[in-house]
Amino acid sequence: MGSFFRFCFLVCVKLVVRTIYRFDQVWINSKPEEFKDTKLFVLLNHTSLFEPIFIGAFPYSLLWQMAKRFVYPVADKTFSRPLVGFLFRLFAPQTVSLTRNRDNSWEHFIALAKEKNSFIGIAPEGRMKRLNGLDKHGMPMNIKSGVADIIKMLDSGKMLILYSGGLHHIQSPGSGIPKLFKKVHLKFEIFDINQYKETMIKVSDKDEFTRAVISDLQLRRDMNCTPEAECQGKLAVKIV
């Protein structure tokens, strides 16, 4: 599928979704007019396989960049499902089947991410949150180190964060058919990658960049919670 036809597909998804769901969306800082220099898209608070619903809130200029150069991983179990895997492959020019291990699948994803024009998407918690607030193994929803590796690798452009209010009220893992005509809560934040890296270096020890990124993103997730999450009353590092 070429970029134009994929863009048309994404626009159709957006229009259909907006007839079914209402969106409560906030831009924490100024909403950009275009996303040509956006290199990294981070989804925080991963709760459902129905997160493509968020496309209903994406600006058309963002959809165009996704249609041309988006690269994102999908869990191998999800990727291998005939219908679901096919649908997820329609959303981007390159979709990578990823295992839970640092193996060849991760190396392949990183190789694609290194390409000059790539627009990388990642849900850095790795697993979906269940109704009890934990992952399917009963573990806390912590940020994994892979996102810090990607940030280290990038030397220009912007990072766009989507803070999800959660989709358990629409469809929780294992619950089947999604509920219709609900409100979707989300926030966006965008900032310069190099400024972010410089800030993380300043607030961390020499060899603790990864830990600083993980801590900061977890605080941002908690601070920018919406109705399905509880705020922790903490402040993330301000990016100037």
Predicted regions and their residues:
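A cross-family acyltransferase "interaction/gating" segment
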Residues: 130, 134-203
